[in-house]
Amino acid sequence: MYFLMICWHKPGSQAVKKAQHDQHRVHVASGGNGVVRVLTGSALTEADGETDVGNFGIFEAAGEAEVRAFVEADPFTIAGIVDSVEIVRLPDRFKAHRIQPLSS
């Protein structure tokens, strides 16, 4: 199954996010040690295109519980910068083959 995750960060959390960024990238690259397959993702920004306000990801996973487990183990979540998370299942017709995965 495929899922879209939208994560909003707490205002003023940029310094903590920057400090956790490398660990976050390792987590993403491993799919949370194989809990999910990360297809793509990126930061979400203000209209200026620079000020981070969150992030999104598209995942292949056995179910929503696995995506939640991935989010809960993310260094950004552990560091306390996550304000809210929305996880939405994508339709079976989603064309995942068009995306070069970020994790295996």
Where are these regions (language model features)?
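Conserved, structured core segments of small domains
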Residues: 1-104
